[in-house]
Amino acid sequence: GQILSIGRVQTPTLALIVKRQEEIDNFKPEPYWVLATIYRDTQFTATKGKFTSKEEGEKAFSTIEGKPFTITNVTKKKGTEQPKQLYDLTSLQVDCNRKYGYSAEMTLNTIQSLYERKLTTYPRVDTQYLSDDIYPKCPQTMNGLFQTTFAGKRPYAELVKTLGGKPLLKSKRVFDSSKVTDHHAIIPTGIPPQGLTDVERNVYDLIARRFIAAFYPDCKFATTTVLGEVDKIEFKVSGKEILDKGWRV
């Protein structure tokens, strides 16, 4: 059989990916029914949840069919979403598996190759933070990303350009020396990559975009929730409106 390195950092990921695959393989979809109504071109769904039998759903529907729908409450809440934390090995393996279907071992081999070519930092890490002494080097790394070219295009130029002309944001979610021991989170070195395979490029791209996003402001949004009722049965719809994309650009 194959020998897999079960290190302190790697075990949870392999277990996580294997467990997830087992869940997918063993998943048996079960049919269910929900009560829904259209009001002013918007679908509202009953808050009482799912019906496991069609008869049960039809019975509930028959009690409200043809009765008037009334809006009972409208609330609007503002919220923010912070940029995702930088990658450690585990979170990178999970994202590569989720987005590209790469195994934990494949991601590790790829990131090891990028590290050996001095394109990304040391990969076998279990921290998502940078030490404070890395901050002064970040503009230089950004400059390298700005110049990076893949197939005649510069995928990071616009993202980096938006951050130009002002000091980079220094967040405690990114820079915290107390959370770093021997090695820090995985980031690009700033050396523009050349001759990457498709797999290498995909892994590099995740790391580069995560690094750039760490210096962007929070994404700001508003969530509107509207409640209505028909004959004491409550219906609800929620919508999210982005007010300022921030790092989600």
Each PLM stretch: what is its role?
Residues G1-V249:
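Core catalytic DNA strand-manipulation module of type IA topoisomerases
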